[in-house]
């Protein structure tokens, strides 16, 4: 093989490796708190802002309410706990809710119920969420 052909082959190989490395860096993480952070909305019109400091704010339309709280993450499981609310919120929604989460793509967040007794929260959380 001539020197020119070798250089060309190495350049192509280097470019392919570089593309693979860059593509690997752009994948969406599948667990941990960073997966959840952002502002999300669902088909019910609920807006859920999840902050990196372990706090969140929810603005719901049905029932119309503002909810603030904290969350903890273990792997792909999140526990949410309301700390303050305004508007009509059922009494059984004062305890924690536990959900498994996944990121089907970069702009979608999905939850599956593990343990929760708050029906409005279950109805909202288990909807597909889209990054705002």
Walk through the language-model features, giving the residues of each.
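Bacterial N-terminal signal peptides that target proteins for export
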Residues: 3-14
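Short, linear, compositionally biased motifs with a strong N-terminal bias
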Residues: 16-19
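N-terminal helix-cap/turn-to-beta initiation motif at the start of protein domains
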Residues: 26-41, 48-51, 130-132
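Edge beta-strand at a domain terminus
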Residues: 27-29, 110-132
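Contiguous, well-ordered beta-strand patches that form the walls/edges
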Residues: 42-43, 47, 58-117
